């Protein structure tokens, strides 16, 4: 099941990301229409289907960087194959709406931080956006927020040796939310049930 839009918005509000939050969208995301609101969370499915997989994005105008954080670290081709979703189209739309010279540097996640059967993608996306809000020039690594999770190469994310790392990532993320989101704490049992490490069978 994963996270709902309402849950993500409430958690992001607790994390003080709301001032930067463009919104939550399905795969029809129109692009970055406001430089003052550079952080959307986008689902790979149409909203009427109930959603599939959350991806966080962030636009940093000072250096025309477009950050795309997929907790699985899938390539554009893999996202197209699995979810019929392409971020290159989003990148083109974003360049048209947000950059004077229409030149955007794509910086995407290539490692996996989420377990293969986990439904925690929305929460990991929220963690990334909090990292961006506090460290917009360096949201992917090298700061105390995002460094609580450790990536493994995408091609090895189903290996037995990777699973303890990915499980620890999810536990660290939960602990972060326990310390920083009253909404998460008050709904912890239900959120953990819906985003469990072994939710997808």
From Swiss-Prot:
GO terms for molecular function: cysteine-type endopeptidase activity; DNA binding. GO terms for cellular component: host cell nucleus; virion component. It comes from the Viruses. SUPFAM superfamilies: Cysteine proteinases. It holds the Pfam family Peptidase_C5. Its main location: virion. It catalyses: Cleaves proteins of the adenovirus and its host cell at two consensus sites: -Yaa-Xaa-Gly-Gly-|-Xaa- and -Yaa-Xaa-Gly-Xaa-|-Gly- (in which Yaa is Met, Ile or Leu, and Xaa is any amino acid). It is found in: Virion; Host nucleus. InterPro entries: Papain-like_cys_pep_sf (IPR038765), Peptidase_C5 (IPR000855). Keywords: Autocatalytic cleavage, Disulfide bond, DNA-binding, Host nucleus, Hydrolase, Late protein, Protease, Thiol protease, Virion. The record marks 50-51 as: Cleavage. Its EC number is 3.4.22.39. The active site is at 53, 70, 121. Requires DNA and protease cofactor for maximal activation. Inside nascent virions, becomes partially activated by binding to the viral DNA, allowing it to cleave the cofactor that binds to the protease and fully activates it. Actin, like the viral protease cofactor, seems to act as a cofactor in the cleavage of cytokeratin 18 and of actin itself. GO terms for biological process: proteolysis. Induction: Expressed in the late phase of the viral replicative cycle. Belongs to the peptidase C5 family. Cleaves viral precursor proteins (pTP, pIIIa, pVI, pVII, pVIII, and pX) inside newly assembled particles giving rise to mature virions. Protease complexed to its cofactor slides along the viral DNA to specifically locate and cleave the viral precursors. Mature virions have a weakened organization compared to the unmature virions, thereby facilitating subsequent uncoating. Without maturation, the particle lacks infectivity and is unable to uncoat. Late in adenovirus infection, in the cytoplasm, may participate in the cytoskeleton destruction. Cleaves host cell cytoskeletal keratins K7 and K18. All late proteins expressed from the major late promoter are produced by alternative splicing and alternative polyadenylation of the same gene giving rise to non-overlapping ORFs. A leader sequence is present in the N-terminus of all these mRNAs and is recognized by the viral shutoff protein to provide expression although conventional translation via ribosome scanning from the cap has been shut off in the host cell. Interacts with protease cofactor pVI-C; this interaction is necessary for protease activation. This is Protease. It comes from Equine adenovirus B serotype 2 (EAdV-2). The gene is L3.
């Amino acid at each position: 099941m994963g996270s709902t839009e309402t849950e993500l918005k409430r958690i992001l509000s607790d994390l003080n990301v709301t001032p930067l939050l463009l919104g939550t969208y399905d795969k029809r995301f129109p692009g970055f229409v406001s430089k003052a609101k550079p952080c959307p969370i986008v689902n790979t499915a149409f909203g009427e289907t109930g959603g599939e997989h959350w991806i966080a994005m962030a636009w940093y105008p000072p250096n025309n960087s477009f950050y795309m954080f997929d907790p699985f670290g899938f390539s554009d081709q893999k996202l197209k194959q699995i979810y019929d979703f392409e971020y290159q189209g989003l990148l083109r739309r974003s360049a048209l709406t947000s950059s004077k010279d229409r030149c955007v540097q794509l910086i995407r996640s290539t490692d996996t931080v989420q377990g293969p059967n986990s439904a925690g993608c929305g929460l990991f996306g929220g963690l990334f956006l909090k990292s961006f809000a506090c460290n917009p020039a360096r949201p992917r690594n090298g700061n105390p927020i995002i460094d609580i999770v450790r990536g493994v190469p995408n091609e090895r994310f189903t290996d037995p040796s990777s699973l303890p790392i990915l499980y620890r990532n999810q536990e660290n993320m939960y602990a972060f939310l326990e310390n920083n989101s009253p909404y998460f704490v008050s709904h912890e049992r239900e959120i953990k049930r819906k985003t469990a490490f072994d939710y997808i069978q």
